[in-house]
Each structure stands twice: as structure tokens, then as C-alpha cells.
Amino acid sequence: MARRGKKKGRAVSGWLVLDKPAGLGSTEAVSKVKWLFGAQKAGHAGTLDPLASGMLPIALGEATKTVPYVMEGAKVYRFTVAWGEERSTDDLEGPVTKSCDKVPVEEDIRALLPRYTGLIMQTPPQFSAVKIGGERAYDLAREGEVVEIAAREVEIGRLDLISIPEPKKAVFEVECGKGTYVRSLARDMGRDLGCFGHVADLRRTEVYPFETQQLVPLKDLEGAAADAETESDRFSALDSYLLDTEAALDGLPEIVLGDDAAGRIRLGNPVIVRGRDAPVQAPEAWASLRGRLIAIGMVEAGMFKPKRVFGL
């Protein structure tokens, strides 16, 4: 019987709130971080376009089990729309497909914003990761295929006009839910204003529950790794940038366990929830032992039932 090979890398776990530089793809960024930390596992919580900069939460080790909770969180973007041109990629990267000399005025732009707030239908860009017949839309688009992508419902909490730095450019900030494409937003606003438009600059500033002040530039990680004299020093310096795995679970009730209950949970068994403030019912909650995440599960009739156990 073949033996399972030993996993390569360190069993390091936690969240890194990376400030991704423009020009680097999300998958490349994850690979870079995984290599720097020598981690066994790594994954991100929501693709950020290569031309975009900003917040890319990256999960290491056991934290990858909490990625879905961050994926569902609200996101905030600051972006610049260049009016007068529509491009194949809906950003600066693609060739111009339509153009117009009209320049929208501030009054018309502001009047348009309520139309893009709340639940709206949005069609993803041709160059997107949406799957069409089992293939990514961007792969089909690169082959010259124009594909029909179905519109989908997305939620926009707010869309604000921040400034108009020059007549043909406007800066916006949007808070939106999962699946929203800022490039589609720019394209659609341009069409509604009768002047076309594309994203000229894009930065993600927040991914709930993480905050701007938690951002770590890639160059800081590379500098910390380069300055370390030993591998031990390197990993110690890098690990100081990590947030605890449970940082992704903000908003879920915490069930505080003792040693005996934690032992039962680790074996996949339910336990009675104790404590004056403990919930009797909760569709999702996380259990902790001395502040460390043990499991995610549900509380039903005063019992915590684990769904996912962590090896932290």
C-alpha cells in the first residue's frame, strides 16, 4: 500500500491582509506569499484584477477553511472612470471598441448614482473568470470569441462620486457584495450617460471584516525576509504580520470551551453550551479554547454541534 507523502512546507496558519501591487495577478500574489512564508497551504478570499491594487486577504494553513466567510463579506473599492471610450476588457488593458466625444457633467453623473444602488442586475465583463460551458470567459475572449454572459443580481450598498479631477475622468467609491464587477459598473454608467467609459484605476480598500490599517505591502514582507540572517529569524519576522485564523469570523457568536469540552469537539462530538451569555440557537458559531479557534458549527437547543474542526 502506497504511503501518503509528507506535506511540503510549514504548518503555519493565519490571515495576511496583503496590499497587492498593481500588475501582479491574485494567483501570483498567493504563490509569492506561500513561498515567502514556506506555508503548506494558501488561498485568497476574492480575486483582484492584475491591474488593480489593494486589499487581497490571503489565508495560510488552517485559515483556508475560513475563506468562505470572507468571500461573503462586503468590499469597498476606490476607482477612476475614464469617459469617452469603451474597451474590450472594460479597463485600460484592452483595445478601444467604442468612442464618443461627449463629456458628462457632474449633475448628470450624480443623478445616475441611485440607479446603481441596492440590488441591481449586472453582466460580467467578457474578460472575467465566469465559466461558460466549463471554460473561463477570459480564455474564450482571448481566442476572439464573443460570448453571451447572463446578467446576475448583485448588491451595491453605496456608490459615491468622490471627485472629478479632470473633465473626462471621475473618481468613485463603491461598497458592494460578492460577485460585483467594478469594470461592469464603469461600462454600464458610461453607456447610460451616453459617453462610454472604462476603469482607468482601481484599488480595493476594504474586505470585511478586515480594515485598511491591517494592510501589509508586499515590499515589507520581502524586506523582512531579506533582512533575516537565519530561516528561523525569517519566519519569526514574517509570522508577526499574520492575524489569527478566527479574525475571519467577526460577527459569529463565540462559544468558550473548557478542556474537556474542547476534547469532545476535536473528536467531532457535540457539547452542551454553558455560560450566561451563550446562545441557545445559532445557525453558525465558533468554539474556542483559551482564545484559540477549535471549531465552527451551529448551536441547536443549547448544544454546539461542530461542522468543521481546526488543528490549531
Swiss-Prot record:
GO terms for molecular function: RNA binding; tRNA pseudouridine(55) synthase activity. One of its GO terms (biological process) is tRNA pseudouridine synthesis. It is an enzyme of class 5 (isomerase). Belongs to the pseudouridine synthase TruB family. Type 1 subfamily. Responsible for synthesis of pseudouridine from uracil-55 in the psi GC loop of transfer RNAs. Transmembrane segments: none annotated. The gene is truB. The active site is at residue 49. The keyword Repressor does not apply. CDD domains: PseudoU_synth_EcTruB. Its EC number is 5.4.99.25. Pfam families: TruB_C_2, TruB_N. The keyword tRNA processing applies. SUPFAM superfamilies: Pseudouridine synthase. NCBIfam families: TruB (TIGR00431). Coiled coil: none annotated. This is tRNA pseudouridine synthase B. Gene3D superfamilies: Pseudouridine synthase (3.30.2350.10). InterPro entries: PsdUridine_synth_cat_dom_sf, PsdUridine_synth_N, tRNA_psdUridine_synth_TruB, TruB_C. It catalyses: uridine(55) in tRNA = pseudouridine(55) in tRNA. Keywords: Isomerase, tRNA processing.
